[in-house]
Amino acid sequence: MKRVREEVYVEPQMRGPTVSSRGETNGRPSTISGGGTTGGLTTVDALTYLKAVKDMFQDNKEKYETFLGVMKDFKAQRVDTNGVIARVKDLFKGYDDLLLGFNTFLPKGYKITLQPEDEKPKKPVDFQVAIEFVNRIKARFGGDDRAYKKFLDILNMYRKETKSINEVYQEVTLLFQDHEDLLGEFVHFLPDFRGSVSVNDPLFQRNTIPRDRNSTFPGMHPKHFEKKIKRSRHDEYTELSDQREDGDENLVAYSAESLANQGQWPGYPKVEDTEGIQIYESNGGHERDPDIGSQKNLLSTNHMAKAINELDLTDCAQCTPSYRRLPDDYPIQIPSYRNSLGEKVLNDHWVSVTSGSEDYSFKHMRKNQYEESLFRCEDDRFELDMLLESVSAAIKRVESLLEKINNNTISIETPICIREHLSELNLRCIERLYGDYGLDVMDFLKKNSHIALPVILTRLKQKQEEWARCRADFRKVWAEVYAKNHHKSLDHRSFYFKQQDSKNLSTKGLVAEIKDISERKHKEDLLRAIAVGTKPSFTPDVEFIYTDTKVHTDLYKLIKYYCEEICATEQSDKVMKLWVTFLEPMFGVPSRSETIETMKDVAKIEDNQEHHDASEAVKENTCDGSMASNLKPLTPPKMPNKENPMIQGSSFAQDLPVNTGESIQQDKLHDVAAITNEDSQPSKLVSTRNDLIMEGVENRSRVSDVSMGGHKVEREEGELSPTESCEQENFEVYKENGLEPVQKLPDNEISNTDREPKEGACGTEAVTRSNALPEDDDNKITQKLSEGDENASKFIVSASKFGGQVSSDEEHKGAESENEAGGMVNSNEGEDGSFFTFSERYLQPVKPLAKHVPGTLQASECDTRNDSRVFYGNDSLYVLFRLHQMLYERIQSAKIHSERKWKAPDSTSTDSYTRFMEALYNLLDGSSDNTKFEDECRAIIGAQSYVLFTLDKLVQKFVKHLHAVAADETDTKLLQLYAYENYRKPGRFFDIVYHENARALLHDQNIYRIEYSSAQTRLGIQLMNSWNDQPEVTAVTVEPGFANYLQNDFLSFVSDEEKPGLFLKRNKAKLSGPGEESLGMSRALEGLNIINEVECKIACSSFKVKYEPHTADLLYRRKQKKATLNPTGPENVKTSDSSELSRKKRISRFHMSLNRRLVALP
C-alpha cells in the first residue's frame, strides 16, 4: 500500500522541480524544467522542493533555516526578487541542482544561470568545513566505531603508504555505500582525477547503489583521479582556517599539513604522484606516527557540531546548582559588538544548565497552580511595563529628532539617517505599533522623515495613554490574584501530606512504624553487644514530649464538642468517661471537678457570707453532728459545659441513690471551698508515686482506716490475689489517676464518730482535711504533703472493694457466678451499699492472673519512681496513645505558630489561636467547609499550617477509636488491670508483675509498655518483643537418659586421687613443706578473687552445651604493695649499696656507647 501511495505523486513531482544530489554537481547536471515559468505549479511542487533542500542539508540545519528565512523575508517584502536570487545563489553555491530547481518558482524575466563546467573554478575548501565533515562522519557512525576508524586509516594510508587517490575513492565508496550524501560530500575534498576508474569497472559496478525513483540523491558518477597534490605550508596554524585559493587543496592535505605545523611529524614529506604511484620522500627520515588522533584540532573536537543545550556538562566544573563551565575545547563564539567593558564583566565560559520542572535530575520544587498564577501576573506586569518604557523612550527620541528638524539643526533637503537618531529598540517599537503595516511605515519614515515623525509621535502618545489606563485597570485584577493565591502558593506540602496522612493514621501503619523502629534498635543492640559486650538496652522505641499542659484542656474541649455535635448520647458518655478517667490521669492532668451547679453555689455563698471565709462555713457544716450520719464524700454531678470535663450522661450523679441529697450538698460545699481558694493558692496538687493527690485525700483515707477493722489477711509477697488473699496494705488510692474509691462507713462506726469527736470526722487528730480549711492551715497541709508525708496520701481499701468480704473459696466462687449471671443492679454500688468510682468498678472483676511470682525481687525491678505512670497495652491501646499524641502535636503546632506570627512586627492580629480554634469548631459542626478552613489556617498560621488540614479526619478517627476501646472486652480488662496495679503502695508496685499479668491476658499479641514521666513530660512507648521480654520456659520433667548423663557424667564428682596436678611441685615447695599441702593451697589462693558467672544451656536431645552471652568466669589477684624496709637495718644498707653500684655501671655503659657513636659521626 505504501508503494501505491508513493506512485500517486509521481506526476506532480515530474511537473515540479527535479532535484539531483550534490554529487551530480560535479558531473553533468540533470535536465530541469524552469526558466521563469510558473504555470502548473502546485503546493506539492513547493513542498517537494523544500523536502529536497532539507534532505540535502540534513547535517547542516543552519542553511535550511537560512533558506526559510529568505523566503519569509521575500513574503514580507523585505527583499525584492533580485535580492532573493543573490542570496539563494550564495546559499546554494556548489549545489547546481538546487539552483536550477529554484528557477521553477521565479517569475518571468528572472533566471539563475550557471557557468560552464570548463570555466567554473574549483570551489575553495575551508579547513573548518573539513573539520565539520569529519565530525559529521563521526556522529553518523557513533554506534559503529569500526567504520570511523576505518575511514581514518584510509586517510592515514593515503598519506603514508603507496595508495593512489583511485584506491582511496574505491575504499571510501565501499565504506559509505549506505550513505550517499557523505560520499558525495567527500568528492568535494578530492582533486580532479581522470581515467583511473571506468564506469564498466567491476569493482565500481559492485559498489554503485541504484537510485530509487523517489530518492532525492541519484547514484554517484565516479571519475578518474590522477593529479599531483599541491601543498603549501604556512607558519601560523590560524591561517589554515582561511579559504584556500588553490583548487587542489583537499581534506587529506589539510590533515597532513595541520599535523606537520604542530610538530607531530619531524620531517614533513613531500608527496608526488608519478604514474599512479605515490612516492614518499622525506627530508630527514620519516617514522610512522603511532596515533593519528594526537591532533586535537582535527580529531578531538567532540563539541564542534553540538549546541550548548546538547552538551553533557555533568563532569564539568560547577559553580552553583545552576551553572557549569563549558569544556576547554568548546569553541567560544566571538561577539560582534563587545567593547573593553564587556570583556571585563561579561561571561563566556559559564552556562546555566536546565533546572526546574523540566529537569528532574536537579531536585527543585515544582511550581503549583497558585504559583503559576502569580508568575503569569508577573509576566503580564513585566510585559506591560516594558511596553510603556519602550514607548516612553521612543517618544523622547522622536521629540528630540523633531526638535532638531524644527530648529533647522537637521536639514530636510538632505536624507536623514534614522538609525543615527533612533535605536533599534525605538524602531522596533514603532514597527510593533503599526502591526502588519509596520514595514511600510518604516520605509516611509526612511524616505520622508519630516512628514512621518509628527504622525508617529501622536500615535506613540495615544498608545502610551491607552497602555497606562490598561495598567491601572489591571492592577486591581492583579491585586485580587495576589491576595487569593499568595498563601496557597507557599504551600507545597499539603497535597502530598493529605495523601500520606490517611496511611499514617491507620492502625496498620502505626504498628508497622514501631515494629520497624524496634527491629532496627534490636539489631543495633546486637551489634553493640558483639562489639563492646554490653547488654541490650531497654529504652523506649519512640518518645514524645508534652511541653504545654494547657493543650490538654483544649483537647478535652475539642473532643467534648465533637461528641456533643456528632455522637449519640450513649457513645458520648463512653468516650468522655474513658477520656477523663484514664487518658487525662495518665498524662497527669488534674481531676476536673468544677461544674455549673458548683459555680452557682459559689455565687450564693459570696452573696450571703461576704465577711466569712468559705472554708469556715464548710468546717461548721462538716463538724455538725447531724451531718456526720450522712458523711459520704461523693462525687458531685457533672453537667455539660465547655469548661467542665464531664458531659451529660457521663457523670456519676445518675448512678447515685435518691436519698443522697444531703451528701451531694455536702460535697458541693467542699468544692466551693476549693474553688474560692483557687486564686490565692493556685497549686493545690502534690506529687506522690504515680500522680498528683488532691488535698482532701487524707480525710477520706482516715475514714477508710476506720472501716478496715481487722480485715487484714497475710499472703506471700508478690502473690496476686485481690479478691481472696490480698494484703490491703499493699494498695492505696491516687485521686489524679481517677482511682478514688468512695466508701460508705458501717453504722456502728458512724455512731462512734458521733460519740467520740476526737476519733470522728471533726476530731483534733482524725479530723477530715477538707478543702474548706483556713488558708493558713491549708498552706501547712500542702507543705507537709509536698515534703513527702506518705501517710497523708494513703487510703486503704477494704476487702469489699475487691468483690466482698474475705470468705472461703466456695463463697467467692458463688458470689462470682452470681455476679456473672445476674449482674449488678447499679454498677457504682457495692454489696454493702457503698459507691465506687470508675476505677473501682474496674477493680471488682479483677482476678489473679499469674499464679505466683518470685517473692524476692531485685530493687531495680520495683518501680520506685514517684513521677511516672506505666501502662501495658495491646495494639489498640497503643494506637489510642499515638492518635492522642498526633492530635496534641498538631494543636500545639497551631498554637506555637499562631503565637509566633502574632509576635511578628508586621502582625495586626492579637488572638490568632482563638481564631484558629473557632475555625476548627466551625469545621467540626459543619458550618464551614474544608476549603474555607484551609484558607483561614494559611492566613492565621502561614505555610506551616498544612498539618492542620486533616484535623477533622483525625478527630473523627480518634473519637471512633475511643469508642472502640471502651466497648472492647480485652481493652477493658487491660484498663482494669491498670487500675488494680495502681492501688499498690509505692514499695509494692513491681513492673515485672504488671508485665506478666498483661502477658497472661494478651498471650501471643503485641505488648506495649507505655510510660509517662510527669517530671520530664515525656511519653515513651516500647514494643516488648520476644527477644527482650519473653520469659524462658522452665523445664518441668527431665528425660531419663539426659538425667543420667547430667548426674553421672557432666556433674560427676572426681576424687582427689584422680585429679591431675594443678600446681608444679617446685611452686608447691616454695609455699609449703612436707605434709603441709593444705597450708600451701591456702597460701596460693591468698588475694585471689574468683567470680563464677558463666551460664550454659544443654540440649536434652543432643547433649550440646551452649554458653549464654554476656556471662563469664573471672579470676584475678590484686597486686600486693611492697613492704616498707627499715632504712637503718643492715639488710637495707646492703641492698642500697648494690643498687647504687648497679646504677653507676649502667651510667658508665651508656656514656661509652654514646662516645662511640659521636666518634663515628663524619
Swiss-Prot record:
Biased composition annotated in UniProt, kind: Polar residues: 18-30, 1123-1139
Region annotation (Disordered) ranges: 1-37, 702-727, 743-779, 803-830, 1121-1143
GO cellular component: nucleus
Transmembrane spans: none
Modified residues (Phosphoserine): S817
Subcellular localization: Nucleus
InterPro entries on file: HDAC_interact_dom, PAH, PAH_sf, Sin3-like, Sin3_C
One annotated GO molecular function: transcription corepressor activity
Residues in PAH domain copies: 28-109, 123-193
Functional summary from the UniProt entry: Acts as a transcriptional repressor. Plays roles in regulating gene expression and genome stability.
PANTHER family given in the database record: PAIRED AMPHIPATHIC HELIX PROTEIN SIN3-LIKE 5 (PTHR12346:SF31), SIN3B-RELATED (PTHR12346)
Name listed for the protein in its UniProt record: Paired amphipathic helix protein Sin3-like 5
Originating species: Arabidopsis thaliana
Gene name linked to the record: SNL5
